[in-house]
Regions:
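Secretory-pathway/membrane protein signature
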Residues: 1-136
Length: 136
């Protein structure tokens, strides 16, 4: 929990209260854990191919959703994720090669879809949110 007497404050004293980010108020064990998590995340992302630049959905007036995405340089395969519009977590759907798939029985109005790129080393990019197809 943030302590706003110490975080995001200029160093000063007002009404007997010391404000500001100072070394004596640091939690170095916590800082080390956060730093390690950041390093591990950056390493995993650096080993992965870039995420697809864009992804689109089709499926109006049908019970299937067509997903298309741009190829990513260095991608060996792609992972498709979906989640209901009222859910917060992605669910893995399938892994495939190519840049298009049809998700049978997945209604586009009720779900969000995303695509990530997978390297030969197994490293995975961030997920690209698939929106509606561009207007023409």
């Amino acid at each position: 929990v943030e302590n706003y007497h110490h975080q995001h404050q200029n160093v000063r004293t007002e009404n007997g209260i010391e404000y500001g980010d100072t070394v004596d108020k640091m939690d170095f064990d916590y800082l080390a854990k956060v730093t390690m998590l950041n390093v591990l995340t950056a390493t995993a992302l650096a080993d992965a191919p870039p995420a697809p630049a864009s992804a689109t959905l089709g499926g109006a007036v049908t019970s299937n959703t067509t997903v298309r995405w741009d190829a990513s340089l260095g991608a060996h395969a792609y992972r498709i994720y979906q989640r209901r519009a009222d859910a917060q977590d992605w669910s893995f759907v399938r892994e495939l090669q190519g840049t298009e798939t049809v998700l049978e029985g997945l209604i586009v109005d009720d779900h969000f879809v995303g695509v990530s790129a997978l390297g030969k080393n197994g490293a995975e990019s961030t997920i690209t949110f698939a929106g509606l197809p561009p207007r023409r």
